[in-house]
Amino acid sequence: MNIYLIGILCIVGLIISQGSTANGSPLDDRFNDVNTINKKQFTEEEFSRLINSMLKKYIEDKNVDIRIIGNKKDKQPTQKTTPKPTTPKQINDGTSDKTSDTHTIKRTTPKPTTPKQINDGTSDKTSDTHTIKRTTPKPTTPKQINDGTSDKTSDTHTIKRTTPKPTTPKQINDGTSDKTSDTHTIKRTTPKPTTPKQINDGTSDKPKSIADIFLINKPKVPLWIVNPLYYMVEKFVQIMGYLLEDDDTLELNLPKYYYDKSI
């Protein structure tokens, strides 16, 4: 857009705004209300009433928030996980009907050994049918452990001593070893140092925001250099305010930091 068109639009806008508020009654009423509020002297009771009402409203809002959170928790019940009871191993002593393939222990009772009858000629019974053979239990020989020193080999009772293989620790390739391992190589990852965030406490030269550039407290950066268009519009508004000054209108008092003290 052309700069002249922008200037014309600004002039028209100012004339319309000044014409609509020429009577000044709405502005006067508003300023009067503000002045009466500022001049009013509040008593201690009014202050206490105001503080109590604010605290009451704060507590009510807080209770509402707590109720909302409680309702959300009630709608989503937590599922309780109960641990399964551990059943003891069943011993099959002959009275139970249930059979367990893995945990059943059979109780074997030894048969009573009856003494062998000796036929001394006085008995009528023949020894062919009623002779009881004395069965002597075989001595239980310990199982032979084939440790390499014995020459005898046992097919059934030989227990092979299996020594566990020593677990070799995984090699960490730190650059000093020549051997490379495809599967057991562990890469040593060093965490990156965390740099603390810089806090702008006012001593730094970097501006905190764009508003710092436009503040007039810094005489090194004049406003008309930073933004010439803004400077021209500001001066134009001041001139139009003085030209249109009447008894019904108020002088345009801009904030202090809008004025350029360096000029």
From Swiss-Prot:
Residues 78-90 have a biased composition (Low complexity). It comes from the Eukaryota. Sequence repeats lie at residues 81-107, 108-134, 135-161, 162-188, 189-206. Residues 70-207 are annotated as: Disordered. Residues 95-104, 122-131, 149-158, 176-185 have a biased composition (Basic and acidic residues). Residues 81-189 are annotated as: 5 X 27 AA tandem repeats. Residues 1-21 form the signal peptide. Keywords: Repeat, Signal. This antigen is recognized by sera from infected human. Isoforms are highly similar and contain variable numbers of identical direct tandem repeats of 81 bases. This is Antigen 10-3. It comes from Schistosoma mansoni (Blood fluke).
